[in-house]
């Protein structure tokens, strides 16, 4: 024989826990609401059919149809509220169900009591089952009024107040936002894909309307430019000028190597200018042509090609004068070196003569 394990008796707390779980199941699983609503409607239909078959259409038991009808009406109302898609329709269905339930129960209780009074009045009415059923239905109506209607309306007011508080808090939070978060929110709206397409078309139209002019390298002509600016611009073209000069004559490389410091030496006197002109006239015609081409290349690199200078002869003359000044300064430096060498040699000769005079003659 198999041993029979005794089943421990369930405590009232466990029963209460099971009942609460059964009643709160639709809250945890929303799809169970439809099952509960359909179950209420089915129970009410079964009650009505069974009462009619049992009484065969006559007798006091027909009054029990009233609670079945109330339960069926409650199930239909809850099912409509659950099937409603929009939030507003759900609120309307819930309100109708919460308000109509106590009235339905109260009407059922009143019908049962009046039927008991009609059958037999006096003290016997307290023992009539219709009266007892009516009083019980009236108690259910009062409980539904407190537990369903009043609680639903109070929760509805709390929900409205909570929504208002959330809106106020959201408005206050948006008003106290820092500028960076506001700018980021505006950028998110501004750089949306729809607005980006519009921005691209607007930019293209704006670019078509504008007339862009090329920015020249130097806005001033050679006459208005300072020597420092000319020096900085001529250094960029020094390599090209050196190649051209070396292909024409061997002397041109020496002159072009000193072109980087040409514009730093201002003219000293009219005498130096005349000397430089005489030295330039003594050079050959080919050498002068090469210098002119190199000078023209340097000037074209400085001034924009769209705006040629009004007096090209003066620009060439300025370049020639600067180079002639260089040559004159080179000659002056050579003369100074020769003078220093001659003075040093004369001092050495004088010192050697004095030493020879001081030596005694030996016979």
From Swiss-Prot:
An individual GO BP term: symbiont-mediated generation of symbiont replication vacuole
Keywords, comma-separated and alphabetical: Cell membrane, Membrane, Transmembrane, Transmembrane helix
Sequence intervals crossing the membrane: 34-54, 60-80, 91-111, 112-132
Membrane topology: Multi-pass membrane protein
GO cellular component, one term: plasma membrane
Biased amino acid composition, Low complexity: 246-268, 275-285
Comp. bias intervals (Basic and acidic residues): 322-342
Stretches the record annotates as Disordered: 232-363
Main subcellular localisation: membrane
Keyword Cell division: no
Location of the protein in the cell: Cell membrane
Biased composition (Polar residues): 232-245
Family classification: Belongs to the chlamydial CPn_0443/CT_005/TC_0273 family.
Protein name in UniProt: Uncharacterized protein CT_005
